[in-house]
Amino acid sequence: MNTLRLNIVTPNGSVYEREDVEMAVLQTTAGEMGIMYGHIPTVAALKTGHVKVNFHNGNEFIAVSDGFIEARQHQLSIIVQTAEPASEIDVERAKLAKSRAESHLEEDDDNTDINRAKRALERANNRLRVAELQ
């Protein structure tokens, strides 16, 4: 069976690479999308969620933030601000981040950046959801 090369890149560089991907399932802004070897060239906007990576002897979940994907016949590139395999998510740290974001949203303070706090809460909740998938 032909397989796909997957590369997930953040501003800090490549954070996940795999050469033997049979299928990657992503949440795009247009809905869920599955990418396999031979997929037509595609560019799509990715929303905060997870990527499910299927390979010969199992699968893995990666928490990702908003970003973009580029699919080619034999390669899938995912460009996001943050990405973290479920196996590496520090659940306690994610719970603290969630609590901090909720506190910022509850503050009645002109200095609170509401949009930033909402994004932080969304990221923390996503990390907690993905950690449970592992």
Curated annotation (Swiss-Prot):
Pfam family for this entry, one: ATP-synt_DE
Basic and acidic residues biased stretches: 94-104
Broad class of where this protein is predominantly found: membrane
UniProt keywords, alphabetically: ATP synthesis, Cell membrane, CF(1), Hydrogen ion transport, Ion transport, Membrane, Transport
Locations listed in the record: Cell membrane
Transmembrane region(s): none
Membrane topology: Peripheral membrane protein
Residue span of region Disordered: 94-115
Coiled coil region boundaries: none
A GO cellular component annotation in the UniProt record: plasma membrane
Function of the protein: Produces ATP from ADP in the presence of a proton gradient across the membrane.
Subunit-level organization: F-type ATPases have 2 components, CF(1) - the catalytic core - and CF(0) - the membrane proton channel. CF(1) has five subunits: alpha(3), beta(3), gamma(1), delta(1), epsilon(1). CF(0) has three main subunits: a, b and c.
Family statement drawn from the similarity comment of this UniProt entry: Belongs to the ATPase epsilon chain family.
Family annotation (NCBIfam families): ATP_synt_epsi (TIGR01216), PRK00571.1-3 (NF001846)
Protein name, as recorded: ATP synthase epsilon chain
